[in-house]
UniProtKB/Swiss-Prot annotation:
Main EC class the enzyme belongs to: transferase
Species whose genome carries this gene: Clostridium tetani (strain Massachusetts / E88)
The gene coding this protein: glmS
Annotated keywords: Aminotransferase, Cytoplasm, Glutamine amidotransferase, Repeat, Transferase
Identification of the protein by name: Glutamine--fructose-6-phosphate aminotransferase [isomerizing]
Every Glutamine amidotransferase type-2 domain range: 2-217
SIS domain boundaries: 284-424, 453-598
Record's subunit section: Homodimer.
Catalytic activity field: D-fructose 6-phosphate + L-glutamine = D-glucosamine 6-phosphate + L-glutamate
PROSITE patterns linked: GATASE_TYPE_2 (PS51278), SIS (PS51464)
Major localization class: cytoplasm
Entry function: Catalyzes the first step in hexosamine metabolism, converting fructose-6P into glucosamine-6P using glutamine as a nitrogen source.
Length: 608
């Protein structure tokens, strides 16, 4: 969740580091800092809070140097504070380290280093690293880092500089993302590609346990045995301005409005009328499909909600039993998996720590794994057997919108593909579903026209302390996502329930004026859902309903009805979520919250 940037070249390092860190703000952070080598001395500036605080500090106490490392920290060990911010230095101030991840054996290492005379000034796990590297340093920084890392247990992406070797940056990764940027006589390390895109499009994608040595002459990669590695350069084709706001007030609003396009992009070349579905990076034969007796879908947060839609859709169309698990729970329950199990992992970043751990657990037990991810070359995409990329483009706002939509599209593509390969749908049925799916981008565009309605609704309801979301079947999965969006960015306590469960407890929470938002797009369940709405309105709730155009009965059941274009009920989640995203956005705006960077949250959760 932290962001790392490192630089060596001919330019001033400080502004490049700060600019790079600003491109990683979406990852979430509570403090920031840089270390620059100036006249063979490491100068460190760091502080709690936003990057603007660090920039003010740098303006007051400028640093001149063409080599350095920078960091935005998300607290895991030790509170957010200046002393706990990175970079961390050894006592002599000759070695400086930035780190993303968790050192699991830091207590043992700290006790041992303390017994060796080292003094600690922070509460972080990271501070063991500069002391450990110092302990093993004998004039060769790369060798010292390699030896120190061999003593470390946990996950890490690390950048190191040393004033005694002022022409080097050393880095290493394990279970935490790190890339190398290859510029014109300048080189970079970073947690993610956007940090270097203003300077280069050529990068190395590092694998676990690989070390980097950057000098002004170039970059060398090594394995943990010290053997040099050759790596193909990956050329980034998307533009840096893809991560800009494009005239919208916030990234989140921009990304909501990009959804019709990214839905279409994710379907392109995969869903075509009159042609079989062919997926470039999935190589499951018909024979292998026949042997699959169970599917696990594993994900976290919003991606988990996409997985719930995937379960319903795959079971309905392909008739394969599907279980959906939260990744952080899955890996500890000793799941029943074998070679005839298929696992689908969903992660926008492709670096979600719990999802990656679940993937590895499944592979250990012999399962085949399909990754659904938005990031080419991410850890999850490299370790899975098959990949279905979601073409959402960079998503900057912490609260996911367009990435969620493309994850839903991926679930529908897989469901149709499995049905095609297993023969559970005939050609006419497949063509009918594909034709309807291809109409979704235009219908999603129409859903954006609810903007003004949701804005007015937000202005009337943003002061409420509690809200509830209801739905049945696929509507329940969307209710969960709508509730999560609201609590993520507006900090309003919100819960989602299967509408039929109301009478089993949740109805006790309904009182005069309670806001209840109900989705009613599943036609076979519409009447039952309306009955549930009546149960809450008779107890004083203010009901808001989302239904298809033409469902005029909704007007009579709720105080405010929002209508979306009609589609087949199975595809409703792609449309019904859009008004809920807009509502959450405008409630957050009314409350004066930080829409793109909500408190306590990070975009990419790369620690367990």
């Amino acid at each position: 969740m932290c962001g790392i940037v490192g630089y060596i070249g001919k330019k001033e390092a400080a502004p490049i580091l700060v600019e790079g860190l600003s491109k990683l703000e979406y990852r979430g952070y509570d403090s920031a800092g840089v270390a620059i080598i100036e006249d063979q001395v490491i100068r460190t500036r760091k502080c709690k809070g936003r990057l603007v605080n660090l920039e003010e500090k740098l303006n007051e106490e400028s640093m001149i140097g063409d080599i350095g490392i920078g960091h935005t920290r998300w607290a895991t060990h030790g509170e957010p504070s200046d002393k706990n911010s990175h970079p961390h230095n050894n006592e002599k101030g000759t070695i400086s380290v930035v780190h993303n991840g968790i050192i699991e054996n830091y207590i043992e290492l700290r006790e041992w280093l303390t017994s060796e005379g080292y003094k600690f000034v922070s509460e972080t796990d990271t501070e063991v690293l500069p002391h450990l590297i110092d302990y093993y340093y004998k004039g060769d920084l790369l060798e010292a880092v390699m030896t120190a890392i061999s003593k470390v247990e946990g996950s890490y992406a690390i950048g190191v500089v040393c004033s005694e070797e002022p022409d080097k940056v050393v880095a290493v990764r394990k279970d935490s993302p790190l890339i190398v940027g290859l510029g014109e006589e300048e080189y970079f390390i970073a947690s993610d590609i956007p940090a270097v895109l203003n300077h280069t499009r050529d990068i190395y994608l590092l694998k676990d346990n690989e070390f980097v040595l950057m000098t002004k002459d170039g970059v060398k990669l090594f394995d943990k045995e010290g053997k040099e590695i050759k790596r193909e350069i990956y050329h980034v084709t998307w533009n840096a301005d893809a991560a800009e706001k494009g005239g919208y007030d916030h990234f989140m609003l921009k990304e909501i409005h990009e959804q019709p396009k990214v839905i279409k992009d994710t379907m392109t070349s995969r869903i075509m009328l009159g042609k079989d579905i062919k997926l470039d990076n999935i190589e499951i034969s018909k024979e292998q499909m026949e042997k699959i007796n169970k599917i696990y879908i594993v994900a976290c947060g919003t991606a988990y909600h996409a997985g719930l839609v995937g379960k319903y859709t795959i079971e309905k169309l392909a008739r394969i039993p599907v279980e959906v698990d939260i990744a952080s729970e899955f890996r500890y329950k000793n799941p029943i998996i074998d070679k005839d199990t298929l696992m689908i992992v969903i992660s926008q970043s492709g670096e979600t720590a719990d999802t990656l751990a679940a993937l590895r657990e499944a592979k250990k037990k012999g399962a085949r794994v399909i990754a659904v991810t938005n990031v080419v070359g991410s850890s999850i995409s490299r370790e899975a057997d098959d990949i279905l990329y979601t073409w959402a483009g960079p998503e900057i706002a912490v609260a996911s919108t367009k990435a969620y939509e493309t994850q839903l599209v991926a679930m529908y593509i897989l469901a149709l593909y499995f049905a095609q390969e297993k023969g559970t749908l005939n050609k006419e049925e497949l063509e009918e579903l594909k034709e309807e799916m291809l109409s979704i981008p235009d219908k999603a565009e129409k859903c954006l026209e609810t903007d003004e309605i949701m804005k007015k609704l937000a202005s009337k309801t943003h002061m409420k302390k509690d809200m509830f979301f209801l739905g049945r079947g696929l509507d329940y999965a969307v209710a969960l996502e709508g509730s999560l969006k609201l609590k993520e960015i507006s900090y309003i306590h919100s819960e989602a329930y299967a509408a039929g469960e109301l009478k089993h407890g949740p109805i006790a929470l309904i009182e005069e004026g309670t806001i209840v938002i109900t989705l009613a797009t599943q036609e076979e369940l519409f009447d039952k859902t309306v009955s549930n709405i009546k149960e809450v309105t008779t107890r004083g709730a203010k009901a808001i309903g989302i239904a298809f155009e033409g469902q005029k009965n909704m007007d009579k059941a709720v105080e405010e009805a929002i209508y979306i274009p009609k589609t087949k009920s199975i595809f409703a989640p792609l449309l019904s979520v859009i008004p809920l995203q807009l509502y959450s956005y405008y409630v957050s705006l009314e409350k004066g919250c930080d829409v793109d960077k909500p408190r306590n949250l990070a975009k990419s959760v790369t620690v367990e």
